[in-house]
Design a protein with these regions (language model features):
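Short glycine/proline- and acidic residue-enriched helix-loop micro-motifs
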Residues: 98-116
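Phosphate-coordination/substrate-recognition cap region in phosphate-metabolizing enzymes
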Residues: 37-98
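Loop-to-helix element that buttresses phosphate recognition and phosphoryl-transfer chemistry
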Residues: 6-62, 110-121
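Generic beta-sheet signal
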Residues: 4, 133-144
Length: 180
């Protein structure tokens, strides 16, 4: 069984302000950088050595991945690991959004549906894990993406905190949750 460690990026300036980010970007806060370094320390203490590292191309995820694996390590940027696209809703206050689940709500604003998000994420992680010699993989992504993947694997899921690490097993094309 192969291991997939799916990490939500560290806290950002817009997280602190409760602003819906989507594909908009925002730098990590000091706390966000600390969350990434804490994950790095935890992986090292457990002897986890990644053979491949992937990240959303958005700066907050890429920076989190860089802090986790250190300088000089190759990180493959994968567009399909990006956050849920909310269209023109991006940049608005989370308080202005209806309660979750949002389903197709963002579609009316030029965004993608929840089904599209989950399909995109599952396909991306399945392609990654099906590659040869992918026994221990780090993928850094975003809150809604992690939540949707967790729901796909377990049938339910809540929004992981910034810096959260979700550990999945992958065998014969199927994922299982091993730890969170």
């Amino acid at each position: 069984m192969a291991d997939l460690y799916l990490v939500r990026h560290g806290q950002t300036e817009l997280n602190v302000q409760s602003i819906l980010q989507g594909w908009h970007d925002s730098p990590l806060t000091a706390r966000g950088r600390e969350q990434a370094l804490t994950a790095r320390t935890a992986f090292a203490a457990r002897g986890v050595a990644f053979d491949h590292v992937y990240s959303s191309p958005l700066g907050r995820a890429r920076h989190t991945a860089e802090l986790i694996v250190g300088e000089g390590r190759s990180i493959e940027l994968v567009d399909d690991l990006r956050e849920w696209h909310f269209g023109s809703l991006e940049g608005t206050s989370n308080r202005e959004m209806p309660p979750q689940p949002w389903g197709d709500y963002p579609v009316a604003f030029g965004g993608e549906s929840e089904v599209q998000l989950q399909s995109r994420m599952v396909a991306a992680l399945s392609r990654i894990m099906a590659r040869p010699q992918h026994d221990c993989v780090l993928a850094v992504s975003h809150g809604s993406v992690c939540q949707e993947f967790l729901e796909y694997v377990t049938g339910g899921g809540e929004l992981p905190d910034n810096g959260a690490v979700l550990h999945f097993g992958y065998c014969d094309g199927a994922f299982s949750l091993l730890g969170w």
